[in-house]
Structures are given as structure tokens and as C-alpha cells.
Amino acid sequence: MKDFKDKVMFITGAAHGFGQVIAEGAADRGMKLTIVDIDEPALKKTYQHILDKGAEVLMVTADVTKEASVDDAVEQAMEKFGRIDLLINNAGIALPGRIWELPTRDWEWIMHINLMSQVYAMKRVIPIMIQQKTHADILNVASIAGLVDTPGMPSYHASKFASVGMTEATAYDLQRANIDIDMHVMCPGFVQTDLYHTENHRPAQYSDPTDPYYQSEAYLKGQQFAKYVITNGKPIDTIADTVFKALEDNRFYILTHPEYNPLIEDRVKRIVTDGAPDVHIMDGIM
């Protein structure tokens, strides 16, 4: 996508972090927006920031873990704007916890928001983009955790590896069908967001505060670690420019932390040389 002015973007997870700065960056570039999030008070702030920039914007409060909610948000966007040129699936959470400790409901939550919300939006929006008969783009926000593995977060890795793989496979399908939609996957490292506030947005269907896991040392240490690495991550103020430059250049993989590239290379090397995961590769990093 070379020209953003007057194009229509649909973005999830727009109340905080990447979603907020990307949405505001889109407004700066003259785009029209549908912004979606479960956190209505915070979403209203993003909405006002975009209005202040003079952009046309629709705000939809929705739980994107539910397919019907995603369908309704897309329908509202189409009613207002009549098209979607850029879909950004950004909604996501992080839940630390080893596989034998993390409650099943947490696995269900993270897979539904980090993966299935992307599936729901793509299933609904790709047919719309095809019918438009004009160029369109889809960007799925995954993580460096979708390219390399680390200890302590198997649910997060599972969801992000799945997002990367799904995006790659969809790119093949679109190319084979000669459909003019370009796919992109963003795999950021640690960035200064409020991702460690995941618990503030937990839907009731995934909540059980009486579960002893949430008072366990493992859980509390995981929360502390998540807060530390995120608050000490890369400043977020360059993310919007990174995203839109990548879209202009039609880059498929959008990486924000080149210092992690050796970890990606090491993982591929281990795969092709019959190597095995070695926790010591994380020494000095995690």
C-alpha cells in the first residue's frame, strides 16, 4: 500500500499500545478508521485523539474472542465506510505460566484472542476485499515469540507461532488464487506497552479468581517478569512509522528488534541440524 490518504482501516486492540499508536498514525496519514477494543473507557480516549487530528473514525466496543462480535464490528464498519482497505489484527494478551500450571481457561483465552480473533476478522473481511476489486492489505500482529521460543510462556508462544504460520499460509493461498491482497506479519520484541495489564481486560467467561494458581508464587513471579521486560523494552514512539514504512515497502515480515535475529537464525539452524532446545541460549537475554 503506497498511498494511505482516504483509505479505510479496521484495527482491533486500538485502546492501548501498538493499536493506539498505529491508529493515531493512520489518522495522521489521512486514513478513515474503525477502531475496536473491549476496553471502552480507554478506547474513547483513542477515539478523541483521532477526532482531534481531523480524521473520520468509528468506535466499536467489542470482545473479539467472540466471532459474532467481530462480525458485528465489521458490519458497522461497512455501514459507515462501505469498504475496508487495511485490516490490522492487533488485539492480544500475554499470560506467563508453565504448561502444567496454567489453567485451561487461560489457554482458551489466549488462543481465542491472539489467534482466533485474527481468524474471525480475516474470514469476514477477505471476501469483502475480494468483492471490492481493488488492492488491500492485512497485517497480523504476532510477536518475536512467534519466531523464537523461550521458557515460561508456552501458551503465548503457541498462539504467536500459530499466528505467523496462519499468515504465511494465507499469503500462499491469496497468491495462488491471484487475489490482490498483500499479507504482513509483525513480530515485535519487547516494547514499552501496558501488555502486562492483561488481567484488567479478562472477560468473565475466562475468569475464576478463586483458582489458587492466581495466588501462587509461579504466577506472581511471571507477572513481575512480564512487567520488567515490557517496561524496559523499546520505546513505542517509532512503531507507527515502522508499520507504515513496511506497508509502503510491501514487507511481509515486520521485525522491530534486529538484535534478536541471531536467535531466529539459531532456531532454524537447530531445526535443520537435528538440534534441540537449549535453555542456555537465553543466558543474558531472559
Curated annotation (Swiss-Prot):
Localization: Cytoplasm
EC number: 1.1.1.-
Pfam families named among the record's database cross-references: adh_short
GO CC entries: cytoplasm
Function text: Is involved in a saturation metabolic pathway of polyunsaturated fatty acids, that detoxifies unsaturated fatty acids and generates hydroxy fatty acids, oxo fatty acids, conjugated fatty acids such as conjugated linoleic acids (CLAs), and partially saturated trans-fatty acids as intermediates. CLA-DH catalyzes the dehydrogenation/reduction steps in the production of 10-oxo-(12Z)-octadecenoate, 10-hydroxy-(11E)-octadecenoate and 10-hydroxyoctadecanoate during linoleate metabolism.
Classification via PANTHER family: PKSB (PTHR24322), RETINOL DEHYDROGENASE 10 (PTHR24322:SF736)
Family of this protein: Belongs to the short-chain dehydrogenases/reductases (SDR) family.
Entry protein name: CLA biosynthesis dehydrogenase/reductase
Organism expressing this protein natively: Lactiplantibacillus plantarum
